[in-house]
Amino acid sequence: AQSDAGGRYAGQAQRLERLVNNMMGCQVDFIIRGLDTASRSIVASRKDAMLRKQRTFYLTPAADGLPQIREGRIVQARVTAVAEKSIRLEVFGVECSVLARDLSWEWICDAHERYTVGDVILVRIRSVDVSNPESIRVEADPRSVTDNPLPERLQAVKEQSRYAGQITEVRRGIIYIRLHNGVNAIAHNCLDRRLPAKKDQVSFVVTHINRDQCVAVGIVTRIIRQVL
């Protein structure tokens, strides 16, 4: 039993260490709980600081009788962690994750292309769940605070024309590409003998433009550069 408890503690410690390492460079709030003048060190709690912010911004009505953080509002959020396929945000004391595909109008390969730990960004609040005050949940949307540039960019794309781009994903036989002109594109076929993979640079020929979905449809004719 002691070894099981020790293993759980070691696993938790490793998880906390990874979380802290991922947050390197991020500004955080904390409440001082203790002070040791001899060693010139303090004991502080980030959790307590986040709970205080939650009470202030999510649970306490403002002058209009509504909480400051609510659905539809545009607010600032801190980027606390960045991975290839998602980022983690702190929105006034509540943390949430946003998938890379929901970060911008144009598809991206890696969230590190756009975000770094410590960034402060604007997000639109999609939903807030305060049914359990001990576990408030929020859904944040960074993409919708900017205008969608894709319809205008598609105006410059011509059928049967050739463009270069980067593969952002290969899923279920469909190749997702961000063209260098900022247009999203999909291909179901690749004429190159090599297998296309994420982050490869490719040549793409447009066969159809889907303006409803704001994507160019076509064929990958050649892999210009593979990322191995």
Label each PLM-derived region with a short phrase.
Residues 1-228:
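Single-stranded RNA-binding regions, centering on S1/OB-family and related RNA-binding modules
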